[in-house]
UniProtKB/Swiss-Prot annotation:
Localisation per UniProt entry: Secreted; Bacterial flagellum
Alphabetical keyword list: Bacterial flagellum, Secreted
Originating organism: Caulobacter vibrioides (strain ATCC 19089 / CIP 103742 / CB 15) (Caulobacter crescentus)
Protein name, entry field: Flagellin FljL
Keyword ATP-binding belongs to the record: no
Nucleotide-binding recorded as keyword: no
Entry GO MF terms: structural molecule activity
Subunit structure: In C.crescentus, the flagellar filament is composed of multiple flagellins of 29 kDa; 27 kDa and 25 kDa.
Gene Ontology CC annotation, any one: bacterial-type flagellum
InterPro entries attached to this UniProt entry: Flagellin, Flagellin_C, Flagellin_N
Function text: Flagellin is the subunit protein which polymerizes to form the filaments of bacterial flagella.
Amino acid sequence: MLNSINTNPGALLALQNLNSTNTELAATQGRINTGKKVANAKDNGAIWSMAKMQSATASSLNSVKDSLQRGQSTIDVALAAGDTITDLLTKMKEKALAASDTSLNTASFNALKADFESLRDQLQKAATNAKFNGVSLADGSTTKLSFLANEDGSNFTVTAQTLSLTGIGLTATSTFTDAATAKTMIATITTSLQTATNKLSSLGTSSVGLDTHLTFVGKLQDSLDAGVGNLVDADLAKESAKLQSLQTKQQLGVQALSIANQTPQTILSLFKG
């Protein structure tokens, strides 16, 4: 190799190698500090863009889950009201059956009639109050409710099941006035009870479907989050090992540069003396 005091090829090469090591070391330290192998678009534009889109989809599913959970609660309230209503109908049937006994005296009959009418009014209140966040599937105020099903805005629709008096074949004045009408009311209440249980069965089916879809959305979100992690997260164990290797390489590079920088002094020493 030609020795010169004007240029020092060895020092230039050592400096280039050291700069390269420092750049790689800074990148490795950045990955360790952020935990990301792709922290921004300049790291890897295609991967960064893909990860951003997947992350946005996963984030938007939070709104879907919130909507579906509101749907769950709305159905649960309607089902709870339905349980109360079927219990009330059972008691109303008992009162009507007892009142159909022609051997009753007037006082006993009137007491049964009053109990029946009180149960009837309670039934209407149960249906009217079956609201979650001001929304009801049981009071007859709507025919269906739609909740978010996916991040594209598609819906999961639940058909309302009216459990108020009119929804199950009764009225606000349904009652009996004597043993004969009480006997007729037994059949009416039996039909109402069957109607109510059928409607509750439909709500139950909707509840199962909504729960299943909510579970799916949760799993989908977890999968998307994991996919984003696979795209951009750094392997910290690997990066830590690489960091130690680069730090050693950096130290050797500094020493190599120091040695190379001594070459001109060696040349000058040849002229001494």
